[in-house]
Amino acid sequence: MENEIKEDIGKDIFEEDAGIEEQNYYREGQVKEGIVLPLGLALNDTELYQLSAKKKINLICIMGPAGSGKTTFMAMLYSMFLRQSNNNILFSGSDTIAGFEELLNYIRVSSGKTNVELPRTPKDRKERYYHLKLYINSTKKKSNIILSDIPGETFNACKANKDRLDSEVRCLALAKRIVIFIDGKAVLKNAEWNAAIMDTRQLIMTIRSSEQFRAGTNIDVVISKNDEIVGINSNEKVKRRLMQIENNFQQYYKDCKIRFFRIQALNDYQHLDEGSTSLLDLLTFWVDESSNEQKEVKNQYGELQVISQFNRFMER
């Protein structure tokens, strides 16, 4: 009788509509008997491979220097589903809700500060994968998105070292696309911009020499913090750097699909300029197979609706 009760409760708890999916993996200290609720934290390498064995995943490997906005981007991508409505991409669950909420809490508690800074992802942290289960209306399909949070220190250590890249970023073999962040504020100073372009080129060259590389790999170069440079990009030098960024990567086009985006994660729902891409547009580009990837990603700020008071501090 007791076992029957446990089974019935288990079925209710892990219904897909609850937004919590059953996990068959356990971490040290978890009880393996009776009802086991998933921790909901970020996944480690072992848990990622266990998840990929059960489900088809769309892994997006996010790399970039420390402070370039990678972790903020991931937190705000999750928060987008809490504050905006969209009829095409619907949030339908996550194995790592607690992990996302942990990231988002740093932004919430920093809401009164001039600058919002998330703690750096420690290099030795093994839990670095975040899961989003989405439903795509246009294709009537589900998509399990995995976002990897590769520490900035790992980026620096691996950008010119193939062996370290293969040993420390083992998820490249699973990645559907690689996203390389450039701190948008670097565009304001010539030396910093040249260094950022050089680092990005160097990483792409190392990826191409990696054992995990596949011809035709999707690489998206994302310039972050567009809201901090949008008022300055009327400066001819800054404008020229942004307009000519593609010229710096032409030699890699033959075996990589490289695209370029500018985003402002914290002020995403404010339409700041024609050159920026909303988080929703970027996510749609990544997951909606019905869209033609060769088409230019268009802004759709007019279609976004803020449906709650969540994080209204971002309007300041």
PLM features per residue range, with description:
Residues 228-295:
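Canonical P-loop GTPase G-domain recognition
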Residues 177-179, 208-225, 230, 250-262:
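Conserved beta-strand/loop subsegment of P-loop NTPase cores
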Residues 81-123:
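Flexible phosphate/Mg2+-sensing switch loops adjacent to catalytic phosphate-binding sites
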Residues 160-188:
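Inter-motif core of Ras-like GTPase G domains
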Residues 141-164:
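Switch II (G3) loop of P-loop NTPases
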Residues 68-69:
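Conserved glycine(s) of the Walker
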Residues 21-51:
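N-terminal pre-Walker A segment at the start of P-loop NTPase domains
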Residues 72-83:
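A conserved segment at the C-terminal end of the G1
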